[in-house]
Amino acid sequence: MEQLPSNLQVLLQAAEYVERREREAEHGYASILPCDPATPGRRKRQRTNSNPDNVRSVHNELEKHRRAQLRRCLEQLKQQVPLSMENSRHTTLSLLHRAKQHIKKLEDQELRAKSLKEKLRVEQQKLRQRLKQLLPPNTERIRTDSLDSSTLSSERSDSDQEDLEVDVEGIILSGNEGELFVSFSAGLEHSYSTPAHAWL
C-alpha cells in the first residue's frame, strides 16, 4: 500500500507530460533549448559530428518504448480500479484520479477494519475474564488451538463422564453448571449480534 501512491504520482506526471507533448506536436512546436551565443563554434562542431537522423530515430524509439510501457501500466490499472459505467471512454487523467480515490477508500477501510479488530480483541479478553470468574475452580478446561480439534485427558470414571457436558470450546460442565453456561452463552451471542457493517 505504501508504494501505490508514489507510483500513482509518477503515472500522473507521465500522463500530463504525454498530453503536453501531444498538444505541442499538434500546434507544430516543441520546446527547444536556447542557443548560447558565447560558444557558437562548439555547437557548430557538435552539429557536424552528430547525425540528426540517427538522433531522431533513437529518440523516437525511446519515446515509443516509453509510451508502450505507460500504456501497459494503464491497462493493468484499469483492471484494478472500478470504473463508472456512465462514460465508456475514460481519459488517462480521469483513470488516474479514480485510482487515487480508490486507494484512499481502501486505506480508510483498512483503518476501520483494524479498529474493529482491536475492539473485538478487547471484548474477547473481557469475556474470557468474566467466564473465568463464573467457572468453579475445580472445572477442567482444555486448551485448544481451534474450535474443530480438541483433546480430553481425564481420569474420571465412565459413570462420571456420562453426567458431564462438553461445550464447543472444550469446557467440561456438570448438569447445573451447564445450564448456567447456556444462559451465559446466549448473552455472548447477543453481544456479537451487532452487524459487521455498523463498524465498517
Curated annotation (Swiss-Prot):
<keyword id="KW-0805">Transcription regulation</keyword>
<dbReference type="InterPro" id="IPR036638">
    <property type="entry name" value="HLH_DNA-bd_sf"/>
</dbReference>
<feature type="region of interest" description="Disordered">
    <location>
        <begin position="26"/>
        <end position="56"/>
    </location>
</feature>
<comment type="function">
    <text>Transcriptional repressor. Binds with MAX to form a sequence-specific DNA-binding protein complex which recognizes the core sequence 5'-CAC[GA]TG-3'.</text>
</comment>
<dbReference type="GO" id="GO:0003677">
    <property type="term" value="F:DNA binding"/>
</dbReference>
<keyword id="KW-0804">Transcription</keyword>
<feature type="region of interest" description="Disordered">
    <location>
        <begin position="134"/>
        <end position="164"/>
    </location>
</feature>
<protein>
    <recommendedName>
        <fullName>Max dimerization protein 3</fullName>
    </recommendedName>
</protein>
<dbReference type="Pfam" id="PF00010">
    <property type="entry name" value="HLH"/>
</dbReference>
<feature type="domain" description="bHLH">
    <location>
        <begin position="54"/>
        <end position="106"/>
    </location>
</feature>
<dbReference type="GO" id="GO:0046983">
    <property type="term" value="F:protein dimerization activity"/>
</dbReference>
<keyword id="KW-0539">Nucleus</keyword>
<dbReference type="InterPro" id="IPR011598">
    <property type="entry name" value="bHLH_dom"/>
</dbReference>
<keyword id="KW-0238">DNA-binding</keyword>
<comment type="subunit">
    <text>Efficient DNA binding requires dimerization with another bHLH protein. Binds DNA as a heterodimer with MAX.</text>
</comment>
<dbReference type="GO" id="GO:0005634">
    <property type="term" value="C:nucleus"/>
</dbReference>
<keyword id="KW-0678">Repressor</keyword>
